[in-house]
Amino acid sequence: HPIIAEAATQFQARAIQELYPAGGPVRTIIIGEADDELKEQASRVKEYMNYQIVEEMPEFFPDLDKMLFHLPLVGQTFKKVWYDPSMDRLTARFVQAEDFVVSPDSTDLRTSPRYTQIIKLSRNDYNRFVKAGYYEPLGPNEGGADIEESSTVESIEGISAFGAEQDDKTVVLLEMHTYYMFDGIDDADSSDIDAVALPYVITMEQESQTVVSIRRNWHEDDENQEKREWFVEYKFLPGLGFYGFGLYHIIGGLGKVATGSLRALLDSAAFANMQGGFKLKGRVPGGEMDIAPGEFIDLDAVVDDVKKAIMPLPFKEPSGTLFQLLGFVVDAAQRFAAIADLNVGEANNNAPVGTTIALIEQGSRIFSAIHKRLHNSQAKEFRLMMELDSLHLPDEMKFASSGAASVIYRADFDDRLDVIPVSDPNVFSSTQRIAQAQAVLQMAQSAPELHDMYEAYKRMYEALRIQGIEE
């Protein structure tokens, strides 16, 4: 039964609209008192980061799109934000939970003492990183292991481990974010039980256990040597440990019951429509007969012998009770997954806007909570991007945005600004956004002396996602 697939598809379709609007997903806020200089700086950062995501990072939207479909199914995904030396630019890539190893007892990545990303590269891509100085070269007999077994997800999807691309052996790397003490490098002595280990990123090739890179994982000018973060957690529902819960965990049992009930109904209908049974050997002549609708065929048999010679098996019609059970299970799953159609369109057209908003919020409580988690995670992702831009951008760079030449300065990415998603954590759908803007506009029209009509209409246009409002 497609109940889980339907829930995942509808969630993905709603979430992608909120997290990646047409005008770009980033907006800025000013920390402290705003002046004209800060406002211009905030405008430059917002304009550039949206340009960066939409134009310079073509992988951002496909990865986000794919991640938002995986997330409701498995409950936990990750995004890795880093500077890719092979592309010489910033990137943010989707990392599946099965390629990320962390202790289930960890609270979050910031306090986790160790976590590991499993990276699979072709030998050619690995050599590109070597050429960029990111990894050490492997020996002729190191790396390039054949992957003989498909992963669980690949097995479900029907993807074979063997194919035309197996000639290009895969290099499997283990990128470990951990704390370590190197004798002769760190100030502390590893034999001292009170010594404090420092954060490092240590990468090794899985098959040969060869270390291919060691990098400090703190800012060079950071006196406290705090661990830097490169990964962002995205959770569907909080789990009992580190990993979150998805639809498979919560309503997977209902999905199995619905699938079993549907199959039983189909089997029952098939047997009832295509009956078989027993017939006495030799009592009715064999062979094939073509019978047209409304036609009677002559048989060489004694009258009343046909009924006595043939006995069909008593297959029952599909059970009404089983059909009711299927409906109950599907309704229960839909209520939890919040994919049932909202009854907003069926409401009275003359009902107050507040009633419409209440109906929307009541029907989307679960999605509202999930949307707040997505908003917080995406805000962290944008802050990591802002931090990397402050380190890797040139002092001044020109870029084309909205058909005009614009400029961004590396000094713009300072602590006087913060970047957050355009999405509102309290507004989880375009329907709710439009209803709220409509309520404001109606109140403004009823008491124009108490409201700024320009601002009321502007909010309505913004809720409708109309471009070029100022024109």
Please tell me what each predicted stretch does.
Residues 1-2, 29, 37-52, 66, ...:
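C-terminal anchoring/interaction modules
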Residues 91-94, 103, 112:
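Extended non-core architectural segments that shape protein topology and connectivity
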